[in-house]
Every structure is written in C-alpha cells, then in structure tokens.
Amino acid sequence: MKINLFFVFLFELLHFVAAYSCEGDESAAIEAMNVLQVPYEKYNTDPVCAFDNSTVVELSDKTWDHVIESGKWFVQLTAEGCANCTLGELLFNDLSHAFHEKYPDVHFARVYLSSSLELSVRLLISRIPSYYFIDNQNFYRVSPQVLPKNKAIALYEKDGFKSMKKEQGFFSVNGPLKSFYWVFGKALALYGHLSQKYTPLGMNVAIFGISAYIMYRSSKKAKQKQAAAAAAAAAKKK
C-alpha cells in the first residue's frame, strides 16, 4: 500500500512540474528529476523538456482511428502508476522535442491504456510501456532501450526505424485477424464501462449479443464487397 501511494505521489509531482515549458525553470525541473530518482545525465535528457508534454498528443479509443490514419507517428502506450512508465514518459517527452526540431514530420502521441481498453487489445499490448512507430499504417515495434534521444535519433537517421520489428503476418496488428481484435477490443471496453452499472450475468449476455451482432455485420459487409468485386470482374470479361 505504501509503495502504491508513493507512486501516486510521484505521478502527481510529474503532472505538476509538466507546466514548465522547455524555456522554464531548469532548477525546479532538476529537483523534480532528483525526487523521481531519474538519472537524466545518463540518458542525456533535458530536465525541462522532459516535463513538457506539449509536443505529445494524447489519444484514446475514440480518437485513435481519426488521427493515426496517415503520416508518421511515434506512439507510447503506457499507464499511470508504474515506475517504468514514469521514466518512459519523461524520456518520450524529451525525445518529442528533439524530433520536433529536426524532423517535424514525425508526430508523437501517447495512449493511457487504463482508460483505453479497446486499444490495449487491438494493438496486442503485453507489457507497458510499449512503443510503435507508424509510417502510413505500417507498424514497427520499437524497443524501450532505443528511447533515449541520442539512440533514437541515430537509428531514425540510419533507416527510419525500419530495422525495428515490422508487424506482419496472420496474428499481427495489421493481419487477417485485425477485425477480430477490433471487435474484441470494443467488447472489452464496453464490458468495462457497463461493469460499473450492471450485474456480471446481465453484462455477459449483453456483451455476447453485441459482439455477435458486430461480427455478423462485419461478415455481411465483407461478403457484399466480395460479391461486388466478382460482379465487376465478370462485367469486364464481357
């Protein structure tokens, strides 16, 4: 319990100091780094920029598809209340400023999975924090070890993160099961929302029915597209 309260305190401090911009009070930012026990000199991190998240867009289940549909995005998937996540946020903020100056076409985004259950399923998140570099819907998993800005910039200049693991194959984020992940993520998010209002039995029945309906509609649309494509192909032959 004491450990949990301690991390809550650290995150409250983190968001309080985040009011500083990159031109803010460096001594206050350094003091906060020391309280959080972050070796900013080891990571060559600018303490002030590390607490400034103005160049990072916060996304959620509702905004993800509308934003990450084109362009280059470096995305952090994290949660509140863990030590590794705190360090990851600081390094990610600092990195976003470095990229903003050198490569303004690369956008940075953050997702808090505790309030975005759908994305935790759709993006196959098994550990936090996790990172994706998305280049026009091509997903690359980025290792947290690459996060310090010197390493990240050097790697991006070398091959644009293309040496990172690309998500491809049957079970991947962009694979044939993409629609299933979407449906299951929707169901899980809805389940979490309804769990605050209704009994478990009622929720299970409702979620099952809704999931079955969504899958039926998705299957029906897919068949309609296939039929239309077949008809178009037949018309061309004539």
UniProtKB/Swiss-Prot annotation:
One of its GO terms (cellular component) is endoplasmic reticulum. It is a single-pass membrane protein. Residues 20-197 are lumenal. The chain crosses the membrane at residues 198-216. GO terms for molecular function: disulfide oxidoreductase activity. Its main location: endoplasmic reticulum. Keywords: Endoplasmic reticulum, Membrane, Signal, Transmembrane, Transmembrane helix. It is found in: Endoplasmic reticulum membrane. Residues 217-238 are cytoplasmic. Residues 1-19 form the signal peptide. GO terms for biological process: protein folding in endoplasmic reticulum; response to endoplasmic reticulum stress. This is Uncharacterized protein C777.12c. It comes from Schizosaccharomyces pombe (strain 972 / ATCC 24843).
